[in-house]
Amino acid sequence: MYTLIIPAAGQGKRMGAGKNKLFLLINEVPIIVHTLRAFEKDKACKNIIMAINEEERPYFEELMQKYPVEKPVQFIQGGAERQDSVYNAIQHTTDVEYVLVHDGARPFVTNKVIQDVLTAAEKYGASICAVPVKDTVKKVEQGVVVETVERSQLKAVQTPQGFSVSLLLEAHRSAKQSCFLGTDDASLVERIGKQVGVVEGSYYNIKVTTPEDLLIAESFLHVQKK
């Protein structure tokens, strides 16, 4: 069994919508509802903890009334940074050995990816899902190319990311003590010298970040309905 943690206190400035992007609609249903539905049928998911901006609590609670979820959902105070929100959520985790941390704006995660991440977390203590990088990647400084990075060793990392509760708590406490801010939770585990298992993600598992992503998401849903 695991607890799903969703840091949902961000404002999504790149979307330019003037509100939390999780409230934006894909096929007339909020992004966050699509995301929750991806997990609610998973028998291994015990409950869901969402770290939110307290000012948005009424909106989230209204969504849960309009779109009920078949799992217990708990709203807690989010932090100034995503990392703070996850740390706060860990404090509310009880009676489970593992947690999965997932971006609320990744509504197309598949059950296979979820199960693969959980299995790898049980094996290694920490796990991520990732896909091979398709594009050529170059390092650029002051407007000119300084290096072409070897693509064969690169992966684009997604969520969910899975962890034993004790390991993730240790990693977060260490980062907090050193004022270290990582780009994801796995980087905090890497920082304390622990292994992170990697499983195959999905190119459909996009993070809806920009207006263009909303159009892509609508297309994905259209294909799924066929």
Curated annotation (Swiss-Prot):
Keywords: Isoprene biosynthesis, Nucleotidyltransferase, Transferase. GO terms for biological process: isopentenyl diphosphate biosynthetic process, methylerythritol 4-phosphate pathway. It comes from the Bacteria. SUPFAM superfamilies: Nucleotide-diphospho-sugar transferases (SSF53448). Gene3D superfamilies: Spore Coat Polysaccharide Biosynthesis Protein SpsA, Chain A. It catalyses: 2-C-methyl-D-erythritol 4-phosphate + CTP + H(+) = 4-CDP-2-C-methyl-D-erythritol + diphosphate. Pathway: Isoprenoid biosynthesis; isopentenyl diphosphate biosynthesis via DXP pathway; isopentenyl diphosphate from 1-deoxy-D-xylulose 5-phosphate: step 2/6. The keyword Transferase applies. GO terms for molecular function: 2-C-methyl-D-erythritol 4-phosphate cytidylyltransferase activity. InterPro entries: IspD, IspD/TarI, IspD/TarI_cytidylyltransf_bact, ISPD_synthase_CS, Nucleotide-diphossugar_trans. The record marks 14, 21 as: Transition state stabilizer. Catalyzes the formation of 4-diphosphocytidyl-2-C-methyl-D-erythritol from CTP and 2-C-methyl-D-erythritol 4-phosphate (MEP). This is 2-C-methyl-D-erythritol 4-phosphate cytidylyltransferase.
